[in-house]
Amino acid sequence: MLYNGYMITVYSTNTCAYCKQVKQYLTKKGKEFSEVDLDENPAKRQELYLRTNIMIVPITEIDGQLVVGYNLGKLAKLI
């Protein structure tokens, strides 16, 4: 989703506790985001891996910049 002119996407899995925490953080900050569940979308998982060479979740993409894992400091700087 576009937020203040940029897009926020959270790539997550069903069992990832840190993914839930990142989504809660963004919601608490009033940021709209789209979510891609990689468990339900294996093609997107493969596409993301080929693009980033990263197999860790969550991955939060903000205006083309990636935040890997639960890194609230980096998220705060980008939103």
Say what each PLM segment does:
Residues P58-V67:
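A short, hydrophobic beta-strand/beta-hairpin element that forms part of a small beta-sheet core
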Residues L50-T52:
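Major-groove DNA-recognition helix of helix-turn-helix-type DNA-binding domains
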Residues K44, N71-K74:
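Hydrophobic alpha-helical segments typical of transmembrane helices
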Residues F33-K44:
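Thiol-based oxidoreductase modules, predominantly thioredoxin-like and allied folds used
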Residues L75-I79:
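Short hydrophobic/aromatic patches at helix-to-coil boundaries
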Residues L2-K31:
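Local sequence-structure signature of Cys/Sec-based thiol-disulfide redox active-site neighborhoods
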